[in-house]
Amino acid sequence: MNIIDELKYDSNGLIPAVVQEHGTGRVLMVAWMNKESLVKTLALGEMVYWSRSRKEIWHKGGTSGHTQKVKDMAFDCDKDCLLFQVVQAGAACHDGYKSCFYRSVVNGDVKVTEPRLVDPEKVYGKK
C-alpha cells in the first residue's frame, strides 16, 4: 500500500499535520504538508513541511537547528489528517517556545504558559 497516494489532500494538494512530542503526547504544532514534503520527511526521518506563506518546502530546523526527528506517523480514519510523534530539538515554535500552543485562555485572560526557550531575532533574524 502506498499511503502517500491514498491520502486525501485538499484542493491545493495539502494535508494538515498535527505534531506531538514523542513520549508526552504534547502538541507542538500544526503545519501543512504536500506529497513532496511527505516523501522527503519519510526519506530523511525529520519533518519537512510546505510553507503556505512562502509557497515552498521547508525542513524544520534547517535554519535554527530545531529539528524534529520522526518516531511515528499515523493518519485518521478519513485519511485527510496526519499525526506525527517527534523528538523535538529546541523550540518547535518560531516565536521561540517549545510548543506553538504556549498561550492559554484562563478566565477570559490570555496567559503565556511556558518559558521562551530562544530569542527568535537571534535565531531567525526577525522580531
Please report, for each region that a protein language model flagged, where it lies by residue.
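C-terminal binding/interaction regions
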Residues: 2-14, 20-23, 27-28, 33-127
